[in-house]
Amino acid sequence: MKNRVLSLLLVGLLSVGVATAAVKPEVQPVSTPKRVLFVGNSFSYYNNGIQNRVSNLIKSAGKWQAGDNRYRLKTISGGKLFEHIAGIPPLLQNSQKRQWDVMVLQEYSDGPISKKYHQSFVDSSDEIAILARKQGIEPVLFMTWAYKNDKDMTQQLADAYTAQANKLNALVVPVGLAFALAAQTNPEIELYIPDIDGFNETGQEQYNDVLKHPSVAGTYLAACMFYASFYQQSPEGLAYIADLPSAEAKRLQQIAWLTFQQFYKG
């Protein structure tokens, strides 16, 4: 009964424009990649890496095929996509056969909406997409989330990522919209973890006021969103919960699936 009430609440929030994108995706998820390379920064590598969390969901669903499935990560701490460009060709050309089905591109946290870096985001993702497709690899954009105390970023990031994905004729995975929906419906679930700025004279940790990096719950929600997008199936009921409280993981699974339904089908 509680799950049904939450479902109705989430659908209601989505229908009135909470956690939605003004720009609609033109590419629908229709295939299931087996070999996925994530390219990004700390948003992707925090909490043992998004690639491991998605892999564990796939294994939990009984869909992992040893020898066929491969999920890997290429990250630069604090990096932007343009900093990855030089390393892409040698990475893709060190084998006679195609190594990846999909390359997931994750830009710096506010890069797509920053006056300074927006064009860099566009140009870099354009260039990486060309390099990837020359090797038969499809680019996918990783829509990131707003900073915890700057909710206006949600709409801006959603539109920037979706517009660029449409331009590239590529899939975009709406992780940022799932974060926004979770914050609306389950604010007790902490999706962020503070960054340490330094230490005071007594050795106590000093934290940055800007909350942007994902907690384990945040990374798990992102992983559920990728599972839903890559398999076009709900992660609800999967046994892998990343050591989160069971009820919390179930909510995040449900939020990911509802975000999927609204973003791609709404």
Q: Predicted segments — roles?
A:
Residues 1-8:
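Bacterial N-terminal signal peptides that target proteins for export
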Residues 9-17:
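Bacterial N-terminal signal peptides
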Residues 19-21:
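Boundary at the C-terminal end of the N-terminal hydrophobic targeting segment
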Residues 39-40, 142:
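Short hydrophobic segments within beta-strands
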Residues 92-216, 228:
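Alpha-helical cap/lid subdomain in secreted, periplasmic
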Residues 198-266:
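Conserved catalytic region of serine esterases and O-acyltransferases that act on ester linkages
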